[in-house]
Amino acid sequence: MEHPENSSEFAGLTVNKGIGPVSIVNPYLKKGRFARRKLTAADYVEGILKGNVTILGQAVTLVESTVPEHQAIAQEVIEKCLPYSGNSVRVGISGVPGAGKSTSIDEFGIHVLKEKGGKLAVLAIDPSSERSKGSILGDKTRMEKLSVHPDSFIRPSPSAGSLGGVARKTRETIILCEAAGFDKIFVETVGVGQSETACHSMVDFFLLIQLAGTGDELQGIKRGIMEISDGICINKCDGENVDKCHLAATSFRNALHFFPQPESGWTPKVLCYSGFYGTGIKEIWDMVYQYIDFVKHNGYFEYRRNEQSKYWMYESINEHLRAHFYHNETIRQLLKKAEATVLAGEKTSFTAAQDLLDTYFNDLKG
């Protein structure tokens, strides 16, 4: 191998030592300057109770975290914030993709803040994709007015987790938002699968947004979704679509007659509106507050809140048991083998599951 640097052409050249490390321009900037002081649970609680949305956002991030250390702090913060929660009106908003939920929530939020004052938090239940583990986080960009309003707090869905886990975290986020002084909570869900049922289990009023002019409006709606709806609103009631919307509203009203009377005693209403033009928004929120007054008067409001608290207690038990089962080292070693026996036809799914459960409980006994 040739080394041209050793040739006579370069013989008179020398290599200088060079300069040493450059000193920091700002003498007050020390090593580790980017280290942030870790907040304690007391710091989070203090910031939340003062209405500091930056601290609130950080606390919600702790709630969404799967790190055990974060979870421990989050639970302490939630427990200390619990006495300051429960004073909001919680509204669930659901509808199929394309129904205009985000635009509608933007208009709903601006209207209710203008008419009722106070503060509004917008949350989401959007379980991750089973394939990519990603979820829809673009709603905030479509809420152009609320996203810059000083009295609003918009929190997109966690980016990973099962429906039960995401819903529980949303429920806990509601507690933190209420403690921070948000007296109106919107919980948005994509409106497919079981997410609307989870949403219904944490709100006072469940609003279903529908579209007209898509064929048989009633055919594509699950009976269960209509049964849990306290109000149905048909969006895009403008221009040439007005007659179609009113015709669809009549179809929905007729269909509601075949459903049993809701436990609340309230008769669900069907209204038309335009989220784009903002028409009909006032009537929707008049309906929401009529419902709240109605159920507070007959005692159903408090009853439903208590039932929801019990429901989430049992859901938390189920989730923790599930997590503990799958994190058990013995079970993790046996899962692949159990899968193989099922796929080979040596055992049924139920037998394999029972064997794993028996092993798990025996392992607990030690």
Regions found by a protein language model. Give the residues of each.
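Short hinge/gating elements
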Residues: 41-46, 94, 99, 157, ...
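Flexible active-site lid/hinge loop adjacent to a nucleotide/diphosphate
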Residues: 212-243
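Non-catalytic terminal/linker segments enriched in charged/polar, low-complexity residues
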Residues: 1-83, 332, 336-337, 352-353, ...
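Well-ordered beta-strand positions
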Residues: 184, 205, 230-231, 269
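Alpha-helical scaffold elements adjacent to nucleotide-binding pockets in ATP/GTP-utilizing enzyme cores
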Residues: 136, 173, 198, 202, ...
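Long, well-ordered amphipathic alpha-helical subdomains in the mid-to-C-terminal portions
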Residues: 56-57, 272, 283-361
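Nucleotide-state-sensitive switch-loop elements of NTP-binding domains
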Residues: 40-94, 99, 103-195, 202-209, ...
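Canonical P-loop GTPase G-domain recognition
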Residues: 231, 237-294
